[in-house]
């Protein structure tokens, strides 16, 4: 097994964690808002000081690669690449929507064998970034930017119980309005949940090119005009 530093900045939550042999040995989280530019460097420095003080060699850095916040992803990936350069370790990317599934599966809330998981990240209005998986994390439908109405997932809901979660899910459930639609609240993409996915990629040598890797934004960045002009 390996020692992996994990970085997650795809939403307003900033989190950093370290795993050794698959167990979390260090974690830091900030839920106060999009403070990645302020918090992330501090948390990463603390994590690296922790592994150094315990004489634990770092084997890789895992980073949530998107989709999600354009600015957050850019900050997280830049930090991860910097550590990889500085420490000469491997870079591992973990898809954000797949990461969201980990705490749901670990909680064992889903009992139906044919259940589907639908992690959602809020985009804007009734739009979400969403993907569908079965309970083994096999992809059933690829990532899409969905403008949600009552027909969006109907073909899946007519055949399966579907569990929706993530920061885009709650606003959609009333619109989806189907007896097979279930909401799981409080699920966030966190660095401490990245380890099972990162370890698997480490074992399979699924590494990214540190020089050329970029986040998966799904959609182009759209700049917002300020509400007030000075």
Per-region residue spans from a language model:
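DPxDG-like acidic metal-binding loop motif
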Residues: 62-96
